[in-house]
Amino acid sequence: MIKNNYNSSEAKSYIDQAGKDLADQDLALRVYTSRIIGQNPDLVMHGGGNTSVKVERKDLFGNTKQVIHVKGSGWDLDTIQAPGLPGLWLDPLRELRNLDKLSDEDMVNVQRANLLDSSAPNPSVETLLHAFLPHKFVDHTHATPFLILANLPNAEEVCREIFGSRLGIVPYIMPGFALAKKAAEV
């Protein structure tokens, strides 16, 4: 059984260190919860997984815009810090959902072009998956119990029996644009 390791006082400590800015507070909370996930080998088998948070920030002109902070390449969830969750302007990423196809090269280029900080690490190859989902906080893990279920010969049948409509099922697709679009449809 996976234990809930969230501790309200620890979370508050992270938030308090972030200062008064609400977006920075949400990012600090995301750092805290990412570390909890990363410290559990049953959730991040072989280091797999990434996390994100959607916030609002001002652009150079003072306009409030939606931003997504998503785990960057080269960072481990168990030790991640705020710079390991680079921010990207969210609206241009969401517009990509209207495309029928997108090459990996173009996807990476669009992601880099929408970074708030051009020196930030490359965002996860799963950035569009996080961007296309409507949730403020997204945790993408490779949890051992789900990997076991997914590898059963009758995986979909077993998952539907256990979870009913509470779980969306997407057939295997390589990470990237196609997976993000398919997952957003579920």
For the regions a language model picked out, list residue spans one by one:
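Glycine-rich flexible loops
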Residues: 1-186
